[in-house]
Amino acid sequence: MSANFVKEEYAREPLRLASMCLANNIPFEIGELYGGLIVCYPTATEDRVSDAVCHDGSYGRHEGLLEMMGLVDEEAVGDSVEGFLTAEQVFERWHKHWLETHGVEGE
């Protein structure tokens, strides 16, 4: 039997992001990935718009920061992912997208 363990330093920002989503009724799913956590907005299915990770291979992991895929300005960033983001920075984009696509918060 094997167990997956999330490194404590990789959990802080994903859990803060999940807390912000909960407080604002923004749907998300959270799970373990490569020794860290992944937060998917709004789901982890093919309907996923964006996700944020902090794990063994993510940009920003040494500082405990998030790497985001989706809702990234690929032209400005030069990549399909953007790293070294705080939970607040990711949440700001998710919240804006949620309001733009659903009209009101949490509905």
Which residues does each PLM region occupy?
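Mixed-charge, Lys/Arg-enriched low-complexity segments
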Residues: 2-12, 16, 67-107
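Amphipathic, interaction-prone secondary-structure segments
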Residues: 15, 19-67
